[in-house]
Amino acid sequence: MSRTRQIPSEPASSSQLELTEEHTETSSAVPVPATLRLRGADEPAANRLELNEGNSRRIRWSEDVIDNEGMGKKSSKVCCIYHKSRPIGDSSSESESSDSSTSNSDTDSDDEAACHRRTGHRPPTAQGENYASSGQRLSSNSEERTCRSSHRARKTKRKPSPNAYEKMPKTTKGR
């Protein structure tokens, strides 16, 4: 085995270093197989009882979480907030108070803004722009401004660009 140490020759000068090497050889170097076992920290007695009864710790998804195509991959992220269409005379506060999955209006507007950033759609404004040319449909209720576009419609299909493996490297002059 070889060790290398760097020892400064003078404490005031950091530019001069003295290198010394020590060689230590051992003739009986036998590798020892080892097993590392990891255990969690001690848990309170109540948690240990739950684990022993067969209730192992696992993620419990709520009923409104979507199972992506039945593959066991669940996700709670959604692009747009879906609001059921209501008759014109209904109060929006009654239906929202009974629905536990709806959130406050600040979160809705944040989710809506994120939807528009991801999809490239312009959000509706308070001036009443309807963006009919871009294919978006807005609801007649000014409080309910959600993105109801198809998200899949593109005006023109562009020619696919080559990926990194298909591009030729740029040559630089002088090399």
UniProtKB/Swiss-Prot annotation:
Origin: domain of life: Eukaryota
Keywords from the named record: Nucleus
The UniProt record lists the keyword Hydrolase: no
Composition bias, Basic residues: 148-160
Start-end of Low complexity biased regions: 90-106
Principal subcellular localization: nucleus
Pfam family membership, one: PPI_Ypi1
Zinc-finger keyword on record: no
Gene Ontology molecular function, alphabetical: protein phosphatase 1 binding; protein serine/threonine phosphatase inhibitor activity
Function comment: Regulator of type 1 phosphatases which maintains protein phosphatase activity under strict control.
Protein name, entry field: Type 1 phosphatases regulator ypi1
Native species: Aspergillus niger (strain ATCC MYA-4892 / CBS 513.88 / FGSC A1513)
Gene behind the chain: ypi1
